[in-house]
Amino acid sequence: MNQVFFSKIRSLVSADRHRFKSKEMDLDLDLSYITDNILAMGFPGTGLEASWRNSIDDVCELLKQKHHGKYMIWNLSERVYDYSKLNNQILEFPFLDHHPPPLSLLFEIVNSLSNWLKADAENVAVVHCKGGKGRTGTIICCYLYYSCQFEIMDDAKNHFAEKRSKMKKGVTQPSQQRYINYFKEIVSGSHMVEEFVLTFRSIELGPLTKDQANSLSFEIFEHAKEPILNFASSSNSIQIVPINNDNSESNNNNNNNNNNNNNNNNQQQQLYKIIILIQKKVQNDVLIRVYRGDTGKGKGKMKKQIFHLIFNIAFVNLDQCLFGMNEFDHFKSSKKYDPNLQMECRFQNNCTGAPDHSFKIWNIMALQYQRTKSSLNNSITDIKSINEINSTNNNNILASSAPTPLTTTTTTTTTTTTTSLPSSEHSTPQILISSSDANLDLKNCNINCDSSSGGGSNSSRNSNSNSRGGSSNSSSNRSSTSSRSSITTDSIKPSCSSDSICNNSSICNNSCNNNNNNNNNNNNNNNNNNNNNNNNNNNKNSNNNNNESSSNSNDDSDSEASIRKRKNTLWSSGSSIKLKPSPNLSRLSLFNGHRQSFTKKINPNNNEENVDQKTLPILKKETNDPSESDIKNVEIIQD
């Protein structure tokens, strides 16, 4: 019962603020997750205060279970509590309730918050004041804008209000909103802060009634310091000046639609304004408090604050600042005063001292914000350009997926290189590989290329697979033999992977099916090659004579076919192959791990290995492609 009773009291105290509720941990806290790593909460109370505010034990349990060793607390209130329960993970930046922090302190708090969250992606910042809305919201909104999570400050304020309040009421005090705008203008580079000294000449406040003017008292502070001046209505330093009736009547007539009873009464009364002569040098932040005094005793005794006002000297335009009633802080009795009530502050810049141009913390943070924003814009531009390139490549792949007519010159097209078969007499097939990660599988005689070269046309592979159907030693089938012996078109098999540029699933499926068909054809061809090799061994003398006569009598295509036929035996699995690679080919990473200083041959009778000390000459060339001489220098040892 006690827990239910206290829970209802806490809900009434927190009013419209979102609460953190967990049945598993049995917690009900005045705490809200503004982002995944920023928390706003009310003051953690102890003893009797914990009955209507957050209990410090419950807060400690939540942080230890969900963010153990990764949390830091910012205490913005003027009060302290037992920090040892939270492992002393607390930073104190106290300033008054319903007030903004001084401008320099505002930047210090946001900078410390940013440094903590940048140190580790899992770090969590917990910010609290008394109620966890006004002062807390001022700091969090400035950080959300400074970290480039929101490009517009109003969006950051709306986000905080939505996450913290059920009625979407976040930072409501005018001076706190004013300092948030100060922060935005400085960080974005819209306003350059120069610390200088001005002479505060006077304050004018009106229109007021006679009783109101006689009961007011004033205090002027340099923010976060003791008051530098005190003024009461009974003293000689305050002048009460009547306002002209014509002006008052015209002002009242303009506001008849907005104010019914109050304006009718003001039209019948003489209105006044208060003029306070100050003549005091001030700088940085200025705080003005207005009180209602006790006029019954004829003294300017301070009784109750009506409102206060805070601004910074660096943002004074020309020689005056004008503030309306909607810019006064904590003005609860505003209905008793004229709606046109305003305060005018006059300054004079007649100081001989030069302004302070030293490098301040806001200058450093402004530079950091500009760098973060520029890097973010560059990353967004890069993402857009990458998306455009991907869409262009997808369109090109879809356009190239259509079948092309079969021609005598087979061409394999990839994303980066193009491989073709020349038909000249003394030319050899060229291997152009676009990826440096190519590997050679000598058993299956396949060159597995990287996914970057996986955009080859399917028509060329289909034409090659069709030409592998049968084999013969006659000259009429040499065209099929030459197409079967082509390294360029038969050995390159692109792999379909997730990193391939073939984003279209149908194209990848077709290419994979074609590769499966080609593998089946290769198995059949290997069996045919074994039979052909046996026939070649039985008819060696006759084939040599035929080859010599055909080499002298046939045309350029016959000589090219004979070269390809010899080369085809190198990749057949039926014979024992020993290769002496060229150093030029090793640069393509095709023969890595296969370089040997001698060749071995196996004697089938006694299963012993005999070392053949014959060495092969290595021809040095400037290109990376195998030439005809490289192929002729390969020793073929057959059983």
Swiss-Prot record:
Phosphatase tensin-type domain segment(s): 20-190
Feature: compositional bias, Polar residues: 598-608
Pfam families listed in its UniProt record: PTEN_C2 (PF10409), PTP-SAK (PF22784)
GO biological process: aggregation involved in sorocarp development; cell motility; G protein-coupled chemorepellent receptor signaling pathway; myosin II filament organization; negative regulation of actin filament depolymerization; negative regulation of asexual reproduction; negative regulation of phosphatidylinositol 3-kinase/protein kinase B signal transduction; negative regulation of Ras protein signal transduction
InterPro entries: Dual-spec_lipid-protein_phosph, Prot-tyrosine_phosphatase-like, PTP-SAK, Tensin_C2-dom, Tensin_phosphatase, Tyr_Pase_AS, Tyr_Pase_dom
Keywords in alphabetical order: Hydrolase, Protein phosphatase
Record has rRNA-binding as a keyword: no
Keyword Ion transport: no
Domain of life: Eukaryota
Positions annotated as active site in the UniProt record: 129 (phosphocysteine intermediate)
Class of the enzyme per the UniProt entry, highest EC level: hydrolase
Reactions mediated catalytically: a 1,2-diacyl-sn-glycero-3-phospho-(1D-myo-inositol-3,4,5-trisphosphate) + H2O = a 1,2-diacyl-sn-glycero-3-phospho-(1D-myo-inositol-4,5-bisphosphate) + phosphate
EC number: 3.1.3.67
Composition bias type Low complexity, residue spans: 244-265, 395-424, 458-486, 519-554
Stored PROSITE patterns: C2_TENSIN, PPASE_TENSIN, TYR_PHOSPHATASE_1
Cofactor requirement: Mg(2+)
Biased composition (Basic and acidic residues): 619-628
C2 tensin-type domain span: 195-350
GO CC, alphabetical: cell projection; cytoplasm; cytosol; nucleus; plasma membrane
Stretches the record annotates as Disordered: 243-265, 395-429, 451-498, 519-567, 598-628
Function: Protein phosphatase that negatively regulates PI3K-dependent pathways. Regulates cAMP signal transduction to control territory size. During development, a lawn of Dictyostelium cells breaks up into territories where cells aggregate in dendritic streams to form groups of 20'000 cells.
UniProt xrefs under PANTHER family: PHOSPHATASE WITH HOMOLOGY TO TENSIN, PHOSPHATIDYLINOSITOL 3,4,5-TRISPHOSPHATE 3-PHOSPHATASE CNRN
Protein name: Phosphatidylinositol 3,4,5-trisphosphate 3-phosphatase cnrN
Gene designation: cnrN
